[in-house]
């Protein structure tokens, strides 16, 4: 099966996306939108473009947002106010 948006690196994806691990198939990476306000994020996500292979399901937050810890194991993209 051909997976639409499959990628290896960020540079293969368009603006506002990164090449993140698929939620459904861990061996596949897909172009994924950056995190918007209130979405889950990972504090260790690399900036875009990242030259290596990402290990997380989420992309970094959008430029105007920060990845903020909201509970012991949860992080969300929230505005940098």
Swiss-Prot record:
Effect of residue 72 to Q: In protein A'
Protein's cellular compartments: Secreted
InterPro entries linked: Prokineticin, Prokineticin_domain
Gene Ontology CC terms, in alphabetical order: extracellular region
Gene3D superfamilies from the UniProt entry: Lipase, subunit A
GO terms classed as biological process: endothelial cell proliferation
Gene Ontology molecular function: toxin activity
Keyword Disulfide bond: yes
Keyword annotations of the record: Disulfide bond, G-protein coupled receptor impairing toxin, Secreted, Toxin
Cysteine disulfide partners in this protein: 7-19, 13-31, 18-59, 41-67, 61-77
Pfam families reported for this sequence: Prokineticin
Main location: secreted
Expression (tissue specificity): Expressed by the venom gland.
Top-level division of the source organism's lineage: Eukaryota
Role, per record: Potent agonist for both PKR1/PROKR1 and PKR2/PROKR2. Potently contracts gastrointestinal (GI) smooth muscle.
Other comments on record: Negative results: does not inhibit Kv1.1/KCNA1, Kv1.2/KCNA2, Kv1.3/KCNA3, Kv1.4/KCNA4, Kv1.5/KCNA5, Kv2.1/KCNB1, Kv3.4/KCNC4, Kv4.2/KCND2, K2P2.1/KCNK2, Kv11/KCNH, Kv7.1/KCNQ1, Kv7.2/KCNQ2, Kv7.3/KCNQ3, Kir1.1/KCNJ1, Kir2.1/KCNJ2, Kir2.2/KCNJ12, Kir3.1/KCNJ3-Kir3.2/KCNJ6 (GIRK1,2) and Kir3.1/KCNJ3-Kir3.4/KCNJ5 (GIRK1,4).
Family membership: Belongs to the AVIT (prokineticin) family.
UniProt xrefs under PANTHER family: DICKKOPF-RELATED PROTEIN 3-LIKE (PTHR18821:SF2), PROKINETICIN (PTHR18821)
Descriptive protein name: Toxin MIT1
């Amino acid at each position: 099966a051909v997976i639409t948006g499959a990628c290896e690196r960020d540079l293969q994806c368009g603006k506002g996306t990164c090449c993140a691990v698929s939620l459904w198939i861990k061996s596949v990476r897909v172009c994924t939108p950056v995190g918007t306000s209130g979405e889950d994020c990972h504090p260790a996500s690399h900036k875009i473009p990242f030259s290596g292979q990402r290990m997380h399901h989420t992309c970094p937050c959008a430029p105007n947002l920060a990845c903020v810890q909201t509970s012991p194991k949860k992080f969300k993209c929230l505005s940098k106010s």
